[in-house]
């Protein structure tokens, strides 16, 4: 049931919006950039749910393998470094081998608590003992949210992605796109679980991580954890 649901409201959506999504994702978030640049020279890690691979070149002194379920995003990211197509619950990496891991804006797309826990465990599994992982998830408590989220609202929501016409019809000629009413753009609904304050921390600790740092940034909760 959950697999079919996520396939419809997460995976199929990203397959359709991949190019448009990638074109809006190019600037590293400061917390992620700081984490990557703090890693020792020669560190080897994984970026699980890497999207278009925008973090691949942040620190040229580390080696990072990206993975994502979306084939189109992996093709885009493959120009930046080593990439694999992989589901977030079954990544093809050996256990206890990597120094660090990223999970940026991924866990909130899993549709129940057990699957979210499995996803966090799968981020920690490839790490050596003491390896570090950085997690980012959307927050329920979004200050001054333009999306209308609040701590009194529901945690499981749909968030629309308005696909611009040139991405819906990539082979159309420019003159064919002129005069288009933006109201006719297609809205694809993506599923999100909005995390309450402390919920990500509890999930990471249950999965076998120890919290080193945590905070709030850009409408997200984030955690840096060490594998026990």
Swiss-Prot record:
**E.C. code:** 2.1.1.229
Alphabetized InterPro entries for the sequence:
AlkB_tRNA_MeTrf/Diox (IPR051422), Methyltransf_11 (IPR013216), SAM-dependent_MTases_sf (IPR029063)
Which reactions appear under catalytic activity for this entry?
5-(carboxymethyl)uridine(34) in tRNA + S-adenosyl-L-methionine = 5-(2-methoxy-2-oxoethyl)uridine(34) in tRNA + S-adenosyl-L-homocysteine
Q: Which UniProt keywords apply?
A: Cytoplasm, Methyltransferase, Nucleus, S-adenosyl-L-methionine, Transferase
Write down the top EC class of this protein.
transferase
Query: What Gene Ontology cellular-component terms does the record carry?
Result: cytoplasm; cytosol; nucleus
Relate the protein's function as given in its record: Required for the methylation of the wobble bases at position 34 in tRNA. Appears to have a role in stress-response.
Location(s) in or outside the cell: Cytoplasm; Nucleus
Q: What name has this protein been given in UniProt? A: tRNA (carboxymethyluridine(34)-5-O)-methyltransferase
Q: Which SUPFAM superfamilies match?
A: S-adenosyl-L-methionine-dependent methyltransferases
Q: Which GO terms describe its biological process?
A: tRNA methylation; tRNA wobble uridine modification
Source organism (scientific name) = Schizosaccharomyces pombe (strain 972 / ATCC 24843) (Fission yeast)
Any one GO molecular function term: S-adenosylmethionine-dependent methyltransferase activity
This chain is encoded by the gene named trm9
Question: Which domain of life does the protein's organism represent?
Answer: Eukaryota
């Amino acid at each position: 049931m959950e697999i079919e649901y996520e396939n419809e409201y997460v995976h199929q959506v990203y397959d359709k919006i991949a190019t448009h999504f990638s074109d809006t994702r190019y600037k590293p978030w400061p917390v992620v950039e700081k984490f990557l640049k703090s890693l020792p020279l020669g560190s080897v890690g994984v970026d699980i749910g890497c999207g278009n691979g925008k973090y691949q070149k942040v620190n040229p002194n580390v080696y990072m393998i990206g993975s994502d379920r979306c084939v189109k995003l992996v093709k885009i990211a493959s120009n930046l470094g080593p990439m694999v197509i992989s589901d977030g619950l079954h990544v093809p990496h050996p256990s206890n081998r990597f120094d660090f891991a990223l999970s940026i804006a991924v866990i909130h797309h899993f549709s129940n608590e057990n699957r979210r826990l499995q996803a966090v465990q799968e981020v920690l599994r490839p790490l050596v003992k003491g390896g570090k992982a950085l997690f980012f998830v959307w927050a329920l408590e979004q200050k001054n949210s333009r999306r209308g989220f609040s701590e009194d609202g529901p945690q499981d929501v749909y968030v629309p992605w308005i696909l611009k016409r040139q991405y819906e019809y990539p082979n159309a000629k420019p003159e064919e796109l002129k005069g288009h009413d933006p109201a006719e753009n297609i809205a694809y609904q993506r599923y999100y679980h909005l995390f309450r304050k402390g919920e990500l921390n509890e999930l990471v600790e249950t999965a076998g991580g120890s919290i080193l740092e945590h905070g709030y940034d850009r409408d997200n909760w984030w955690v840096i954890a060490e594998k026990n």
